[in-house]
């Protein structure tokens, strides 16, 4: 018995040793002696892409904002392929891991929840297997590479609505939508006809320029408005129709991730001439109409809300109830029906405060308190109240904006809110026109007329950088930092668009969104705020497309700092120029880099 027992113990020990050995082998194969994720990178050189200076030694004397630590990072680890579409502040896995107590009925799970520093992915986001340089605009409006967004769920789910169709190695967009199966162009012309606009053109001679499309699908509505010189902020959450915004951005159509939940939208008051909801599945009656009141906040005086939904036409009991209650709500908000036809109703917001002042005492929703700043949006909760106009706006009876394109260069009426003069505005516009000319001179050896489509200005001020790009076939997401002057309303008054954001956090967009980032003093600013400049560089890399460009306009010490990370980030220098065009930025340097197209070794094996 003793010998038999000893033999059994020996067998168990041998089995445990074998299991441990197998585990160790797997650990070694996965991580490797030099970190699997970091060493797996193969440069574009192997694919005949990108630059040829990967082995160039970095300058170890570069200082980190004036502190020479002698450290030059050789590489960043590469994130797991599962994170190729990571949006750090809209990460459902993070919500689960942190056990956040969120109210799903209020859409809090679709709002921003950013990881604390110890949970950030300090790694490079890999492109999907077989990634290709995106199709160029304007062809991209109608087709994209399937391999770049390998999700065909929507094509099957919405096959009867013409959202998108898979054809070989591409995904085509016929221009349909849930409400406009036969094309957005016909639907748009019908709306213009309802409003009696000349020639059924919705821009109304340039008077209607900025549009907000909530629950936008793949943004075909906004895409087809571009030909009418109408700029649309297409918004949708990363919900069950996941990747709809990613498709929009891959197409070269302005779009952003977001939701009408509990926080204000990151746009100032009086930003849009038209808001649009086509079968957007939003309960507008919830919480005393708070979501409809948020739309009211961002609409200009006399602005429209176009609503295409069964509630506007269906005759069943439930839809009729919703229609009655919604009609009563907007009437108390002083909206009037501008037009109603078939399945669409278009309401109009009042031009002045007259109707608000004539309401019976105690009428709900109430007017917002006088200390409620309608332009404070970053992390600010929505309120179920009506944003009335200032005395100046009430007397003006409208926005006072010039029609597009004169609007772009006309001094915005809200300049006075910042104490800016017309002369300052005109000088700023001319200064950035000259700067953009310089940028394109530096970029010209690397770009063609269609190389760049999606652009972000990371610190947009009055929007003059974007204004200088008017003659180019591009669109610009103008970002205004949350802790500076809220000049975003000037940007919207110029017929441009953008969002308020803190660069201490990740932006609400997918990886590989932008062809060009403009970073004016933003790296210096982030350092002053005590946030990580390395995290910012990784975020810039995340949202930049492979082969995309970054224009850094900052202090020489900042440029020296960035140069230390070029090799690790797989960026290469395109050009440098000392800034000598203004006293304000006399010590600034223009430094342009290009992101290389690289693939992981797993991707290369799949290609072989």
From Swiss-Prot:
It is found in: Golgi apparatus membrane. GO terms for cellular component: endosome; Golgi apparatus; Golgi membrane; Golgi trans cisterna; plasmodesma; trans-Golgi network. GO terms for molecular function: methyltransferase activity. GO terms for biological process: methylation. Glycans are attached at residue 342. It is a single-pass type II membrane protein. Its EC number is 2.1.1.-. Residues 34-608 are lumenal. The chain crosses the membrane at residues 13-33. The keyword Transmembrane applies. Signal peptide: none annotated. Keywords: Glycoprotein, Golgi apparatus, Membrane, Methyltransferase, Signal-anchor, Transferase, Transmembrane, Transmembrane helix. The keyword Transmembrane applies. Residues 1-12 are cytoplasmic. Belongs to the methyltransferase superfamily. Co-expressed with the galacturonosyltransferase GAUT1. This is Probable methyltransferase PMT3.
């Amino acid at each position: 018995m003793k010998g038999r027992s000893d033999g059994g113990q020996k067998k168990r020990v041998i089995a445990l040793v074998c299991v441990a050995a197998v585990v160790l082998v797997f650990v070694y194969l996965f991580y490797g002696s030099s970190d699997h994720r970091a060493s797996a990178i193969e440069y574009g050189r192997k694919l005949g892409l990108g630059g040829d200076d990967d082995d160039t030694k970095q300058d170890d004397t570069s200082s980190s904002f004036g502190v020479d630590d002698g450290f030059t990072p050789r590489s960043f680890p590469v994130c797991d392929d599962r994170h190729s579409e990571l949006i750090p502040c809209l990460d459902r896995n993070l919500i689960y891991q942190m056990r956040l107590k969120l109210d799903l009925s209020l859409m809090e799970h679709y709002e921003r929840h950013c990881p604390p520093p110890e949970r950030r992915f300090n790694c490079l986001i890999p492109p999907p297997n077989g990634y290709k340089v995106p199709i160029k605009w304007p062809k991209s409006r109608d087709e994209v590479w399937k391999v770049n967004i390998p999700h065909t769920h929507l094509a099957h789910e919405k096959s009867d609505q013409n959202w998108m169709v898979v054809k070989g190695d591409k995904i085509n967009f016929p221009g349909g939508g849930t409400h406009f199966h036969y094309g957005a162009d016909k639907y748009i012309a019908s709306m213009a006809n309802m409003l009696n606009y000349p020639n059924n053109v919705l821009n109304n001679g340039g008077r209607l320029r900025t549009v907000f499309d909530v629950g936008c699908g793949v943004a075909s509505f906004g895409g087809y408005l571009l030909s009418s010189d109408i700029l649309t902020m297409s918004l949708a959450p990363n919900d069950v129709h996941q990747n709809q915004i990613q498709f929009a951005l891959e197409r070269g159509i302005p779009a952003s991730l977001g939701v009408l939940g509990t926080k204000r939208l990151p746009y100032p008051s009086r930003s849009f001439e038209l808001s649009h909801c086509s079968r957007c599945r939003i309960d507008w009656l919830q919480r005393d109409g708070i979501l409809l009141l948020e739309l009211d906040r961002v609409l200009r005086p006399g602005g429209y809300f176009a609503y295409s939904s069964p509630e506007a036409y269906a005759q069943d009991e439930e839809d009729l109830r919703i229609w009655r209650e919604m009609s009563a709500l907007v009437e108390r908000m002083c909206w009037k029906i501008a037009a109603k036809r078939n399945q669409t109703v278009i309401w109009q917001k009042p031009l002045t405060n007259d109707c608000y002042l004539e309401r019976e005492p105690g009428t709900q929703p109430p007017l917002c308190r006088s200390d409620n700043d309608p332009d404070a949006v970053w992390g600010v909760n929505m309120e179920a109240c009506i944003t009335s106009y200032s005395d100046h706006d009430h007397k003006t009876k409208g926005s006072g904006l010039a029609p597009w394109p004169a609007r772009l260069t006309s001094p915005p009426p809200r300049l006075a809110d910042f104490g800016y003069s017309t002369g300052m505005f005109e000088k700023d516009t001319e200064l950035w026109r000259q700067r953009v000319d310089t940028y394109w001179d530096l970029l010209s050896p690397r770009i063609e007329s269609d190389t760049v489509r999606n652009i972000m200005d990371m610190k947009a001020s009055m929007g003059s950088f974007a204004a200088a790009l008017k003659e180019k076939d591009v669109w610009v997401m103008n970002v205004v930092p949350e802790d500076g002057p809220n000049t975003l309303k000037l940007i919207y008054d110029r017929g441009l668009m953008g969002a308020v954001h803190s660069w201490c956090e990740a932006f609400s967009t997918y990886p590989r969104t932008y062809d060009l980032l403009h970073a004016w003093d933003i790296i210096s600013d982030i350092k002053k705020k005590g946030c990580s400049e390395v995290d910012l560089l990784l975020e810039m890399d995340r949202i930049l497309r492979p082969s995309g460009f970054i224009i850094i306009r900052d202090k020489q010490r900042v440029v020296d700092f960035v140069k230390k990370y070029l090799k690790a980030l797989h960026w290469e220098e395109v050009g440098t120029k000392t800034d000598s065009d203004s006293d304000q930025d006399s010590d600034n340097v223009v430094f342009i880099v290009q992101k290389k197209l690289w693939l992981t070794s797993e991707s290369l094996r799949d290609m072989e």
